[in-house]
């Protein structure tokens, strides 16, 4: 089967879509600094986001997706009430490295991208 005809569950397509959404890359970047509790992660994401604050529901959904794909590990303590924290797995750390490299490439190429956009817009 050719690469163009694979199903929607293709891992490459799924992970690229995940990285391309509004919050996933930011979550990876923040968790690369260390394990964080849900509320701390939400606070940091809200502080560094150029857009609106992330909602509790969206953060929970993103974390569940990252956990399902093996990029994030969830730790629940036996305290009352339980404390939940999140950290990158080894796969998540490797994905973070790749995401960081993509960010660096965009930064290095931003002038070239802006020129291409200007040329396109004036055509």
Where are these regions (language model features)?
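Basic amphipathic alpha-helical segments that dock to polyanions
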Residues: 59-67
